[in-house]
């Protein structure tokens, strides 16, 4: 068992660390404070081949593996979790299901748009009355001739008001429960598509989150993703992969907070010496480091398993659960080390703590992750 990254993965980490330091970190505070979508940096990430990087080269992607994508999200999130979130959603929740379940015609049309075409992707599953219980969605798609007519709405959609391509889940047969859910590829230009409420959130201010509304929206029949009635399975499989992205995001937040706290405590002198020299902060740092290392191993393991094409549902849930809860603990403890300064916007700690919280909620709450893990333990 080799725990060393390949040369390719090392180069990807180096590239993303440099990009994050030079392009992402300098605008992270302003992105949060002014609720700005980091458009220029996302365009640069398209140019670097990070957006849609796991898409095969014949469709415009880099042909990278899931571990490479996780490393990119991790590095970006050390400075700006919003940027990491945008990439994670695009790569894991839009490109991936189209690549995995799309027809050759769908892949040939949409994957180049999501790579070299600089079109942003999104994933529409959650509804006002269907959060953790995704089977209770009310959005409907009725077949009329050569197209479907879709009505309903989705909420909390990451990339919502900037995305061009959406993977949407709707009921095609309400009498069949989860077996009546189908998946569709939807474009923001389709008649009847509109963006509703822009969410005002506690954190991730640079990640555009919105309600998406479908009013008699026309969806061509050929835009059904996978077979009719298989949408729920597609959603669950996609979320497995998406959880690796959120684990990487949360890991990056924790690592970034740890580094900020280390640097601050080395320079902050109290009672005649840097506070990093006191035993209590050192014990806290040890716990932070331990948690980050464990989270990294869990996340990379899940990513490698996905790349090998074997089942990784439990491993993805474990990585997401551990990293998200560790990010919340680490940012809270790191902020405490800054004292009163940590509570101000002069330092990034309060932003990191606000950003960390959502990782315990979206892509399946911590409670849902525990359900998934226990369900895959043969109990």
Predicted regions and their residues:
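Short Ser/Thr-interspersed hydrophobic loop/turn segments at strand-loop and sheet-helix junctions
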Residues: 49, 73-77, 170, 186-191, ...
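Conserved hydrophobic/aromatic beta-strand scaffold that supports enzyme active sites
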Residues: 122, 138-140, 165-169, 183-185, ...
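Alpha-helical interface subdomain recognition
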Residues: 1-89, 101-106, 113-118, 131-134, ...
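Flexible, small-/acidic-enriched active-site or ligand-binding loops
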Residues: 136, 189-220
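Short Gly/Pro-enriched turn/cap motifs at secondary-structure boundaries
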Residues: 114, 129-132, 156-159, 173-175, ...
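A short, Trp-centered hydrophobic/proline-enriched beta-strand micro-motif
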Residues: 117-125
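A short core secondary-structure module
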Residues: 146-147, 151-195
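Flexible, glycine-rich active-site loops centered on histidine and acidic residues
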Residues: 95-101, 123, 135
